[in-house]
Swiss-Prot record:
Belongs to the tRNA-intron endonuclease family. Archaeal short subfamily. It comes from the Archaea. It comes from Pyrococcus abyssi (strain GE5 / Orsay). This is tRNA-splicing endonuclease. Pfam families: tRNA_int_endo, tRNA_int_endo_N. Keywords: Lyase, tRNA processing. One of its GO terms (molecular function) is tRNA-intron endonuclease activity. The keyword tRNA processing applies.
Length: 170
């Protein structure tokens, strides 16, 4: 992308009405959610695209830095930092990453040009405890919607390791 696309802060997300944003980001690369003539991005998506230099985010007339967007995200979600690391890692690998809140997970992940997602991603810190019941519930939901459940574990060095959790029938 050559020219940076302007987005505007609106609560816990950003939006643009520019056709270029809709074509380049939504239609061609799977970013955001289209509602009417507005493309909405989550703060994680916005931070990622600002860091890449593809968009700029304005709050009133002031341009927000990557760090400011990150702080906004962290204020709204204490795990924003690790979710961002996982989001960035998956996007950098070429996957389309969307919210999976309605599935009880953090992200749903699509292969490029796929109509349906293959994976549900749950993000955890390495030091975090997860009960067997929590894990079972997440796997059941994933299985019920024909997705693979993946735990993305972020360690103290901010490295991400992915574990596929499966339901096995004997």
């Amino acid at each position: 992308m050559k020219k940076v696309i302007e987005f505007y802060l609106s609560g816990d997300r950003v939006y643009s009405t520019r056709e270029k944003a809709i074509n380049q980001l939504y239609n061609n690369r799977g970013y955001g959610e289209l509602k009417g003539n507005k493309l909405f991005l989550s703060l994680i998506e916005a931070a990622y695209l600002v860091e890449r230099g593809w968009i700029k985010v304005l709050d009133e007339d002031r341009e927000l830095t990557f760090e400011e967007i990150f702080k906004l995200g962290k204020r709204k979600d204490e795990d924003f930092d690790i979710k961002y690391l996982v989001y960035k890692d998956l996007r950098d690998r070429g996957y389309i990453v969307k919210s999976a809140l309605k599935f009880g997970s953090h992200f749903r992940v699509y292969r490029k040009n796929a109509e349906h997602s293959d994976w549900l991603i749950w993000v955890l810190r390495e030091s975090e405890k997860l009960s067997p019941n929590d894990m079972t519930a997440r796997v059941r939901v994933a299985h019920g919607v024909r997705k693979n459940m993946v735990m993305a574990i972020v360690d103290e060095d901010n490295d991400v390791v992915y574990y596929k959790i499966e339901w096995i029938k004997f």
